[in-house]
Amino acid sequence: MSDITLGIIGGGQLGSLLSVAANKLNIDTVIFSDDKNSPAKNFTKHFISGNYDDEKLIKEFLSKVNVITYEFENIPYKILKKLNEIKPVLPKPEINKLIQNRYTEKDFLNKNNIRTTRYSLIKDEDDIKINDGLIPGLLKTCTLGYDGKGQFKIDKKENISSEIDFTKEYILEKFIKLKKEISVIITRFGHQRYEIYEPIENLHEDQILKYSKIPAQISEKIKNQATDWATIIAEELDYVGTLCVEYFIDNKENLYANEIAPRVHNSGHLTINSHNVSQFENHIRAVCGLEKVETKKIYNARMLNLIGNDIKDFRVKNFKDNEFFFDYQKTEIREKRKMGHFTIIEKEN
């Protein structure tokens, strides 16, 4: 085994897949999760369960690892900062703090001349009425919320849901005429040192990623712009590791940055089978200071997210040589819960 032991905060499927990639590189992992039933415990030799602010567990975690990363962005900044004072946390905690808030994230993008949909900070119901130029639009909590949680469609300023809790801050984003969604995954190893995956075309159902494919059916102009913006973002953040930028394309072929995920990303699961180096392996290589390997696409690919009961048929299915199924080994099947993914690879024409 390597002399490096990687600490991973978070025990979901991304933690599992990071641990699998680390093992491939002979790197031990220690997964720290606040859920004792986290599926990632099945993919590591060392699993710590408890509250992230538990001093005893933090001390145990730090004693076992050389470097720390995380599989989701909603970890309190103060915890990442505290860990980083003793062992390096990558990506840097300050990046996570910036991106945890949708308003500061959008401001960062706009300050770097990266187009987003029009938006405004919303603190109360009157702010929505004042910003009626953003209606119809989508109201999102500034912090927390993923896969459509904490979001409300606003079609008229008179029709504001009573479910909206105005003790929280929100961001109101104007709807565009959406044609397509894509994502770009990039791994930054240091100043101007990158591995970039080609844009991935995505389809969402109920605001949860359902389907991804490469190559994306997009123009060369959009492809280059999306890749350039992802590079600017990674460089401006002084990022280390794998990052994903999600984009919208409207019916006039305008590109908009939707959000930044400071971690490996669901749409990149297909890279496990389509490329010589997956997004997970590249992340491990970057945060652990390993050699950068030129990343090449070997196959075109399609990936299906298995949500809820979708998993049942796949657990008993026989697969062809070009089909790959990954079961996240979650004990409970729930509606809208990501249970696994299925990838088909195809040779380029």
Region spans (language model):
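ATP-binding N-terminal substructure of ATP-dependent carboxylate-amine bond-forming enzymes
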Residues: 1-100, 104
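Peripheral (often C-terminal) accessory segments that flank ATP-dependent C-N-forming ligase machineries
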Residues: 2, 285-349
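Short, conserved charged micro-motifs
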Residues: 56-58, 127-130, 159-162, 311-316, ...
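Active-site nucleotide/adenylate-binding loops and adjacent lid/helix of ATP-dependent enzymes
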Residues: 98-183, 187-233
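Short acidic-glycine loop/turn motifs at beta-strand connectors
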Residues: 188-193, 250-253, 307, 346-348
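Protein kinase-like catalytic core scaffold
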Residues: 195, 243, 255-259
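Active-site "cap" helix and flanking loop/linker of ATP-utilizing ligase/carboxylase catalytic domains
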Residues: 224-245, 251, 261-309
